[in-house]
Each structure stands twice: as C-alpha cells, then as structure tokens.
From Swiss-Prot:
It comes from Burkholderia pseudomallei (strain 1106a). Required for the first step of histidine biosynthesis. May allow the feedback regulation of ATP phosphoribosyltransferase activity by histidine. One of its GO terms (biological process) is histidyl-tRNA aminoacylation. Keywords: Amino-acid biosynthesis, Cytoplasm, Histidine biosynthesis. InterPro entries: aa-tRNA-synth_II/BPL/LPL (IPR045864), HisRS-like_core (IPR041715), HisRS/HisZ (IPR004516), HisZ (IPR004517). The lineage of its organism: Bacteria, Pseudomonadati, Pseudomonadota, Betaproteobacteria, Burkholderiales. Pathway: Amino-acid biosynthesis; L-histidine biosynthesis; L-histidine from 5-phospho-alpha-D-ribose 1-diphosphate: step 1/9. Heteromultimer composed of HisG and HisZ subunits. NCBIfam families: hisZ_biosyn_reg, PRK12292.1-1, PRK12421.1. It is found in: Cytoplasm. This is ATP phosphoribosyltransferase regulatory subunit. The keyword RNA-binding does not apply. This function is generally fulfilled by the C-terminal part of HisG, which is missing in some bacteria such as this one. Disulfide bonds: none annotated.
Length: 382
C-alpha cells in the first residue's frame, strides 16, 4: 500500500479550500457573536459513556472507539458536538438564566452519511439553553437562516417537523413504542412498505396515524391535514400549533412541513428543522429542541440549537475563495519592510516574491503591487 494514501472518505484540505472554509468559519462565528453567543471548545476525545448519553443507537454506531492507554477505559472520538456542549452547560457553567453557546470543530464518523460524504466533518453550530418558549426556537431558526445567507446560499427551504408527534403516539401505544427504533428508521427513510409491515398488528388509530406521517409533507396547509388525520391528543395538538407558529415567523426562506423528517429524533424533544438548497439532496443544516439531553449530566435544561458541516457548505457556497493581495518585491530595505508591516497590520495580504519566483501565485488575486517611486513605497494597481 502506498504510504500517501488516506482512508476511504477521508481527504486533505488544500489551500484554496482551506481558505474558503476559514473565511466562512470567521463569518459565521462573527455573526454568532453578534447575537450574543459565547464560544466553547470541547475536546475531540472523551470517555465513551459521556459522548453517548443521548442520540440512541445511530450515534453509537457513528462513534469511533478506542482504549485509553492511561486509564484502560474506552474512549470515543466525538461524532457530534451537541452532547458535549450540553455537558458544558449542565455541569461546568451551571448558570441559571439563558445561556447562548456556539462552537466549531472537527467530528469523525465511522461511516459516511452519503455516497461522497466525508467521514471527517467540520461542525459549526449554536445552542440556546434555559428558555422553553418558542422564542428560543424562533431565534435559532433565524440565526441558522442568517448564517446560510452569509455563505451565499440562495433559495433556501426550511423543513419543519416535531418530535412530539411520534412521542405522543408511542406514549399511547406500548406495542408501537417497543419497535420505536425500527419505526423511526422506516419513517426517516420514507420506507412505506417497511412501515406498513411494522404497523400491521398495531391498533387501528396508531396504525393509521403512523402510515399517514410520510404523506404529511408540503406547505403549511399540511398542518390542517395533520389535524384531521392524526389523533386529537393534547401533545399532538400542541406540536402542530408550535409548527404553525414557527412557520408563520419565517420571512426569508420557503417553508415546508415534513412530519416524517425525523433526523436525530432520538434526542430531540420538540420542534425539529432542516435547511435544503437546490441541487443538494441532503440537508445543509439541521437542528431542533432537545430539552432532556442535559439530564445525563445532572441538570436537564430547555435547549434548542442547530449545526452544519462547514466543509460541505464550502463545497457548494459561491463565496470567492481567492483573496485579494498585494505583490511586493524581496529586498533588504528597511523602508520596504516598514511598508509591508504597516499593510499587514491594516489587514492586507502582502506576498513578497522570493528571488527567482516572480510569477503571480495562482492562489491569490494580486491585483496591486508595492513599488518604489521617488524613494517611497506606494501601492499601484497591477
């Protein structure tokens, strides 16, 4: 085997892509800060049981595991940063009021989520803790849409779902709850034959409701169909009311209701959402409410948030990757060094052409040059 080969679905990030990713990362973190979100940096590696307190079997299967050579305990390489941020809020910060946190860092998956997906993602996201009202859900959804617009993406569609619908059906029907994982997988995959098979022996009301969920997709008027087709349980009525309210608040994206879009259902407890753009089959960002995640760390708090993969966003974003730069000569000249230093302090990119390498670098758009005129160094267009 060649020593330069990387594992499947793992890739190096080359300069032009890395520059674009970093530009987007800075834009998003600056925007998060403008909303009042504080950044945290959880470790890449934790004890396995700490990483898997929520998320169900799906998260367990996605998590790399290894043995700690110091303690002998099993460690995990994080596959999702959300549980880690919940741990920080519940156990380390221990604040009583509203806490807004954001993060950015790599996550690793044992298997890719799509045919060409990377197993190493750069996850960035934001979370609100401490407020159970829909105001927090609305702010998080607005921040997610704001962030996606900052990356240059257009024609965004926001799909809304609610974990409370399925939870209410399971709470009423123990037989359905016992096969909850299989039902979740069938619903999430829109696998109608499998769904029909799993619901054949359930009660008539539960069977009809579960089989209706994949059909409850479309604009906000779908909620009227849902009220007609689903049992009039208080939890379901409240969930549909929440979705109607959230859908009405979205002004800068198309809104769709998809009551079978249950990505991450295992740890969500309320409104769930995912953002899609034309030409990309999978969601480019997703999130939702997960009020019970902190319970495993000793303190359950109302929480909602979202995350996205910056590497995937960079791949589809129209943001220009080549940065403007100033080309300067290489000379032993104190005045030149001072001019270059002043420009760099002002935030300019200044590339000094090393002797024998006077060509313009393809990675940068050197649209200006630092030249000597009458004993002074000045900038001129190239």
């Amino acid at each position: 085997m060649s020593t330069w080969l990387l594992p499947e679905n793992i890739a190096d990030v080359l300069p032009s892509e890395a520059r674009k990713i970093e530009e987007l990362r800075r834009r998003l973190l600056d925007r998060f800060r403008s909303y009042g979100y504080e950044m945290v940096m959880p470790p890449l590696l934790e004890y396995l049981e700490s990483l898997l307190t929520s998320g169900g079997n799906e998260l367990r299967l996605r998590t790399f595991k290894l043995v700690d050579q110091v303690s002998g305990r099993t460690l995990g390489l994080r596959a999702d940063m959300t549980p880690q941020v919940a741990r920080i809020d519940a156990h380390l910060l221990n604040r009583q009021g509203v806490t807004r946190l954001c993060y950015a860092g790599p996550v690793l998956h044992t298997r890719p989520r799509g045919l060409h997906a990377s197993r190493e993602q750069l996850q960035i996201g934001a979370e609100i803790y401490g407020h159970a009202g829909l105001e927090a859900d609305q702010e998080i959804q607005q921040l997610m849409l704001d962030a996606l617009h900052l990356t240059g993406l257009k024609k965004i569609r926001l799909d809304l779902c609610h974990a409370g619908v399925l939870a209410a059906l399971f709470a009423r029907d123990a037989a359905a709850a016992e096969r909850g994982e299989a039902l979740y997988e069938a619903l999430a995959g829109k696998d109608v034959p499998r769904l029909n098979e799993l619901t054949d022996d359930l009660g008539a009301d539960t069977r009809a409701a579960l089989r209706a969920l994949p059909r409850l997709y479309g604009d906000a008027s779908v909620l009227d169909d849902a009220r007609r087709l689903l049992p009039a349980l208080p939890e379901i009525t409240r969930a549909l009311d929440d979705l109607a309210h959230l859908a009405a608040q979205v002004k800068d994206a198309e809104v769709a209701i998809d009551l079978a879009d249950l990505r991450g259902y295992a740890y969500h407890s309320g409104a769930m959402f995912a953002a899609y753009v034309d030409g990309v089959p999978n969601a480019v960002a997703h999130g939702g409410r997960y009020d019970h995640v902190g319970q495993a760390y000793g303190r359950a708090r109302p929480a909602t948030g979202f995350s996205l993969d910056l590497r995937e966003i960079a791949r589809i974003s129209p943001v220009e990757a080549r940065g403007a730069a100033i080309l300067a000569p290489w000379k032993q000249d104190d005045a030149l060094r001072a001019a270059v230093g002043a420009l760099r302090d002002a935030g300019e990119v200044v590339i000094q052409a090393l002797p024998g390498h006077d060509h313009v670098l393809d990675e940068f758009a050197c649209d200006r040059a630092l030249v000597e005129r009458d004993g002074a160094w000045v900038i001129e267009p190239r």
